[in-house]
A protein has these predicted regions:
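Structural core segment of the AMP-binding/adenylate-forming
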Residues: 9, 50, 77-156
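Conserved AMP-binding/adenylation subdomain of ANL enzymes
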Residues: 202-221, 228-269
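Conserved AMP-binding/adenylate-forming core of the ANL superfamily
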Residues: 2, 21-73, 90-95, 198
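AMP-dependent adenylate-forming
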Residues: 9-32, 188
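Conserved pre-ATP/AMP-binding loop-to-beta segment of ANL
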Residues: 18-19, 147-183, 190, 215-221
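Conserved structural elements of the adenylate-forming
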Residues: 37-42, 163, 175, 194-215
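Short hydrophobic/charged patches on amphipathic alpha-helices used for structural packing
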Residues: 11, 44, 94-95, 170, ...
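A short helix-loop-beta submotif of the ANL/AMP-binding
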Residues: 56-57, 63-83, 87-91, 99-105, ...
Length: 269
């Protein structure tokens, strides 16, 4: 069976659902699919101008949020390799995963940003704050310049409007090409990295389409509860729904029973 490009599915969904709601932080802002595309493009510009090349590793560690999802999609559609890290991990575990994976950049959430020690990750070129993509740490002039002049560079590249036809993502050349490295919880010492090819991401989406495809349609509201840094949550509460054109809500905090009940009452997923 011929396996289509996973990134082509992401690109098609963004273009097909351009003016529909895509990602919402519960009780916060909503990004439509065209907003996601715009943010992805800005991150691509920052990656390119800071020296990130295809195949470089980019780690992400933070609670579920719209900006986490955008950073993950930007990583894959640029051709870099994503390294999602569970935000519940202890700082030493996070340091070890970043170092072991040879990550060049690290995206961090608000809590993780206060817990990690950049000096324990000496090969990182930069740490980026997920809520606004500002720089927590920059160790290269190119990264600093790229972030400080990001809006200017975006305006030069797209002087009038950013349109559907500008969405042109990296397409993996082989389904066995490495897409991400997913680290286990480390029940016997430090976490172990699992190499996840693009075909695995596509395969999960294809399985979900077979099982849920007739029940979930574009525009449906979905609440994401499981961590996206975990393969199950990523595959079945994020990637499949994004490809379908759904509207995904993130609680952005610990999903207690009270919060879940309130969110279900308001969103009616």
């Amino acid at each position: 069976m011929e396996i289509p490009s996973f990134n082509a599915l992401i690109q098609k969904s963004i273009v097909d659902h351009w003016d529909m709601d895509a990602l919402t932080d519960y009780k916060g802002a909503t990004l439509q699919y065209h907003d996601v595309a715009r943010k992805i493009e800005k991150l691509h510009i920052m990656f390119e101008n800071s020296g990130v090349v295809k195949g470089d590793k980019i780690a992400l560690c933070g609670r579920n949020s719209a900006n986490w999802a955008v950073a993950f999609l930007a990583t894959l559609t640029y051709g870099a390799i994503a390294v999602p890290i569970l935000h519940e991990f202890m700082p030493d575990q996070i340091h070890n995963i970043v170092n072991h994976s040879d990550a060049k950049l690290l995206f961090v959430g608000d809590v993780v940003a206060t817990q990690i020690d950049a000096t324990k990750m000496p090969d990182l070129e930069g740490i980026i704050y997920i809520p606004d993509y500002s720089l927590v740490v920059s160790r290269t002039d190119k990264l600093t310049y790229a972030r400080e002049h990001l809006n200017e560079m975006f305006g030069i590249k797209y002087p009038k409007y950013f349109r559907k036809n500008h969405v042109n993502y990296y397409m993996e050349q082989n389904p066995d090409e490495l897409a991400m490295i997913n680290y286990t919880s480390g029940t016997t010492g430090f976490s172990k990295g699992v190499m996840v090819p693009y075909r695995a991401l596509w395969g999960n989406a294809d399985f979900a389409e077979d099982v849920l495809g007739k029940k979930i349609k574009p525009g449906d509201s979905i609440i994401s509860i499981l961590p996206m840094a975990h393969m199950y949550g990523m595959a079945f509460e994020f990637i499949f729904e994004f490809i379908k054109g759904c509207h995904i809500f993130y609680l952005t905090r610990i999903p207690s029973p009270a919060i879940i009940a309130e969110a279900f009452g308001r969103i009616k997923p």
